[in-house]
């Protein structure tokens, strides 16, 4: 293996003044260095700076594309034939089940890897000037990947896929003014059917992949234009005026190759051990109990249990997304790029915020489930007030309290305080996702895993 890496390094580094500009060797090198800097700071090669998450995402997208192309040879985008074609794929095609497993698991891993990649960028302040636009591009890519996962989720046309997608698309109906029309446009009618499957198939196999690949290329090019990755530092370190630079080839490229091979090995191992789920055929007349959204939308579904849908989707979720897009302009994250958690105080405030969110979220969910019933306590009041306006006001008050509790006792500066609030919101959302995915049973009632609700 070491010898193979050395030969790969030689292939990259070897050059000749007489080399044909149209040779595959020269073309490949030109392409690579169009989206990669020729020189990188030596300290950015440390694995613990990025954990290879960006490279893993590229590998997972590549696996998605290649396995998706293979799946198209067997898949038929029509309600009855869709399910039957997957049965034939899994039983009659060589390695059909394995190819579908790779596609399924790489899609799920991609969501997690991109989430962690975004956290790494945020906590090292790698979204400030000159990387502000790239932060927005990265968030857009994350949302597009979620859309790609959702459109692909429906394609098996089994009970789980049909009703989980129904739950997700039902959220669109709560957008005032355009929600119902937007829902009908996406589904091609009043409910999921042949038109919806055609739309989702076209989006999943053509529209979204093209946009994702184009934005990924632009994302890497922006990293190159910004001079590569931010140079890692400790909070107490005096910034270097001129970091030590080394050639990307082979120092960076071989490390990326090692990460790519490791990521592929992990996906292939999981795909060998665990099959992608396929339940009974979709039955529009029989809703399973409970009906849950895919795990990456479970946090949003849990929000709908506690907030009026209009407030949960249009106000809380929209404001949170807007705040994340505007983070480079709000003063959050590491004040000096490359410094994890901005400072030693930033580390303490982030840990405190994470612990607070981890405790407050389950307590609030339990109180809302078994104790608080604003609709019953306020008979005659519209639900938009009792289940929307008041809970939202309480939530905003909670955030204000967290801000004050962090700013004053810890004497935190604005970047550390904004960072702690982001940590609080993220941990809260992760907790809501876990609660909905694991601790919700029949009728979306709370229950311990494996215990049936009464």
Give names to the regions the model predicted.
Residues 309-314:
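Glycine-rich, aromatic-lined ligand/substrate-binding cores of catalytic
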Residues 1-295, 302, 317, 321-379, ...:
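Membrane-embedded alpha-helical bundles that constitute the cytochrome b-like, heme-associated redox core
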Residues 453-454:
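Short, solvent-exposed mixed-charge patches
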């Amino acid at each position: 293996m070491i010898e193979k890496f050395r030969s790969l390094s030689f292939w990259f580094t070897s050059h000749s003044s007489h080399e044909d500009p149209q040779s595959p060797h020269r073309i490949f090198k030109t392409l690579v260095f169009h989206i990669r800097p020729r020189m990188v700071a030596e300290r950015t090669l440390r694995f613990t700076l990025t954990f290879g998450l960006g490279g893993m995402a590229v590998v997972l997208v590549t696996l998605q594309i290649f396995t998706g192309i293979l799946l198209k040879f067997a898949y038929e985008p029509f309600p009855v034939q869709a399910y039957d074609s997957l049965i034939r794929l899994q039983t009659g095609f060589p390695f059909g089940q394995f190819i579908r497993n790779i596609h399924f698991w790489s899609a799920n891993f991609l969501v997690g890897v991109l989430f962690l990649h975004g956290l790494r960028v945020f906590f090292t302040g790698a979204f400030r000037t000159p990387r502000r636009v790239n932060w927005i591009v990265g968030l857009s890519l994350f949302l597009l990947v979620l859309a790609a996962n959702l459109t692909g989720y429906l394609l098996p046309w089994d009970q789980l896929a049909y009703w989980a997608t129904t739950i997700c698309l039902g959220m669109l109906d709560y957008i005032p003014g355009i929600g119902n029309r937007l829902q009908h446009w996406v589904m091609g009618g009043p409910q999921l059917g042949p038109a919806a499957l055609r739309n989702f198939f076209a989006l999943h196999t053509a529209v979204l992949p093209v946009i994702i690949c184009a934005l990924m290329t632009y994302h890497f090019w922006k990293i190159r234009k910004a001079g590569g990755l931010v140079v890692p530092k400790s909070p107490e370190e005096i910034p270097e005026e001129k970091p030590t630079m080394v050639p990307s080839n082979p120092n960076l490229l071989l490390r990326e190759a090692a990460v790519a091979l490791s990521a592929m090995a992990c996906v292939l191992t999981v795909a060998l051990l665990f099959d992608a789920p396929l339940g009974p055929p979709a039955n529009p007349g029989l809703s399973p109990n409970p009906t849950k959204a895919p795990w990456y939308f479970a946090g949003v579904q849990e929000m709908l249990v506690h907030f009026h849908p209009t407030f949960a989707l249009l106000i809380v979720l929209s404001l949170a997304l807007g705040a994340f897009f505007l983070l480079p302009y709000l003063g959050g994250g590491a004040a000096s790029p490359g410094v994890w958690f901005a400072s030693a105080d930033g580390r303490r405030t982030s840990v405190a915020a994470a612990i607070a969110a981890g405790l407050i979220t389950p307590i609030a969910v339990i109180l809302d489930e078994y104790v608080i019933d604003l609709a019953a306590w306020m008979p005659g009041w519209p639900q938009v007030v009792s289940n929307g306006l008041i809970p939202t006001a309480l939530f905003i008050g909670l955030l204000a309290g967290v801000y004050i509790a962090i700013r004053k006792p810890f004497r935190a500066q604005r970047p550390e305080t904004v960072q702690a609030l982001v940590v609080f919101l993220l941990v809260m959302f992760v907790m809501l996702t876990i609660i909905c995915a694991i601790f919700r049973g029949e009728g979306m009632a709370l229950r311990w895993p494996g215990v049936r609700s009464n």
